[in-house]
Amino acid sequence: MVHYKSVFYKSAALVCGFVLAGASVAIASSEAAAKTRSKMSEFKRRAVSSPSGGRLSVLDGSFTALANDASFFEANPAGSANMTHSELTFAHTVGFNNSHAETLSYVGQSGNWGYGASMRMFFPESGFNFSPSTGPVCTPASNPIKKLGGLGIVNFSRRFGGLSIGANLKAGFRDAQGLTHLSLGTDVGLQWVGNVAKFFSSAEPNMYVGLSATNLGFTVKLPGSPFVLCRATGEQCCKTCSGRCTGVGTCCNGEKPCCKDCDCNCPCQDEATPGSPHATDTMLRAGFAYRPLSWFLFSVGVATRVNVSNLQVDHSGSALPMRLG
């Protein structure tokens, strides 16, 4: 016998999920399109990051609360202790501008302990290319930045009843058109799971709360030949963009006129000397999820990016960039 009412509810919930996912992707696309100026200058503070997994990509900040599959690593490191099963996964993730990442992850449990490891490589649209440079050194800011890199994560967490505490140790490297950085850092997280106002029978909890701080660490710019290449082919771009362009000539290898705001992607914009560390941009995340019925899940999350060096300089309490998901 077919229970049409149950099928209808499940179908409606699925449609709502697709609508919300589409809205999240649309918002992310508009944000990416709006931030096309001086992108290379921000890379010195970015940790190597390669989120993977369908649930993390769609739920974003709210997955900080759930964190209940192998994509939990960069959402909430406390998730491994509250999982009820082990997972071995391989994920192929395609991002914007056809960039992609390959991820191999394992998570397991032993008593009240959770543990896991994840290895990731990410590539530009050109594919598996391990050449010294991933593309032209100096390009228009409207062009995507080609990135090549790898990331390794080791996770441990401990459960105390419904509360778990976890941490990741992570290391990675990234080459972004000649701007090469090595990143070392850690993630910390807190998760609570339990049963509250539950109207269905299941061994799984129906309420989740999560907090995490990811990418606590530093990046170091590595010396290399791409900067010699940068000075040779991108000299005009770097010099005119670092000052105030008079409008004479072009930059970005002649592809786009130069302006005083430096509308270029050029490694020379990173003024740091090789070997000098920079504090990474830390992501602060919070999430809440509630499942009153077997076919319905409500979740909400928030994430914001901060940098320790900025907080030390600016005490004005200016608004931090924040997103809901």
Swiss-Prot record:
Would you say which domain of life the source belongs to? Bacteria
- Asked if the record carries the keyword Chaperone, the reply is no
Which Pfam families does its entry note? UPF0164
Q: Which keywords accompany this UniProt record?
A: Signal
Signal peptide bounds: 1-28
InterPro entries linked to this entry? UPF0164
Family, similarity comment: Belongs to the UPF0164 family.
Q: What is this protein called?
A: UPF0164 protein TP_0856
Q: Which organism is it from?
A: Treponema pallidum (strain Nichols)
Its taxonomic path starts at: Bacteria, Pseudomonadati, Spirochaetota, Spirochaetia, Spirochaetales
